[in-house]
Amino acid sequence: MRLRHKPWALDYMKEQSSIYIADPSTLKGNWSNEFKNENPIYIEVGSGKGAFITGMAKQYPEVNFVAIELFESVAVAIVQKMVEEPLANVRVLTVDAKDLRDFFEKGEVARVYLNFSDPWPKSRHAKRRLTYKTFLATYEDILPEKGQIHFKTDNRKLFESSLMTMSAYGMTFDWMSLDLHANEPENNVRTEYEERFSAMGQPIYRMEATYTK
């Protein structure tokens, strides 16, 4: 799907400074001050328009959430949602996932969510997948020991390649489903893509993986 450019998006988000963090490097090691509490921080890498992260924030008010979305023209939809319905436990960043070490200290993030990431199906693009080993190393550097990644996708090949990459990295798998909606957990929060693919009859794959190093 072609991304529609919104030239006004960045200026709009900067006006919402209680939601959008324009320079998150200033908060490295100090996110508890930003949220004004010591609650755990969960991040979603590739938040899209924010259905998942805002849904999670409502369901778990005792957790702080940070939406990571590279594209300003997409992230602005999250900010707009929160202007209409404020959530004190969500912040939005427009940064590249490869730079997460610049914004979070080791152990400052309690969990990472990856939902319906770009599958980058061609072998020559494997390094761009958010479950490639270099990204796994980045997440490990901001998570605590035995930190977790929760991963959902509609793409079986991406799911299988992610299983292999995570296994080769030394991670263990605590929970897995090859058809999440066949027996959907009550606490599952769906993303925009999840709703769309489920309506088409496409199975949703999900796993929870833990670092063991």
From Swiss-Prot:
GO terms for cellular component: tRNA methyltransferase complex. Pathway: tRNA modification; N(7)-methylguanine-tRNA biosynthesis. The keyword Chloroplast does not apply. It holds the Pfam family Methyltransf_4. Catalyzes the formation of N(7)-methylguanine at position 46 (m7G46) in tRNA. NCBIfam families: PRK00121.2-2, tRNA (guanosine(46)-N7)-methyltransferase TrmB. Belongs to the class I-like SAM-binding methyltransferase superfamily. TrmB family. This is tRNA (guanine-N(7)-)-methyltransferase. The gene is trmB.
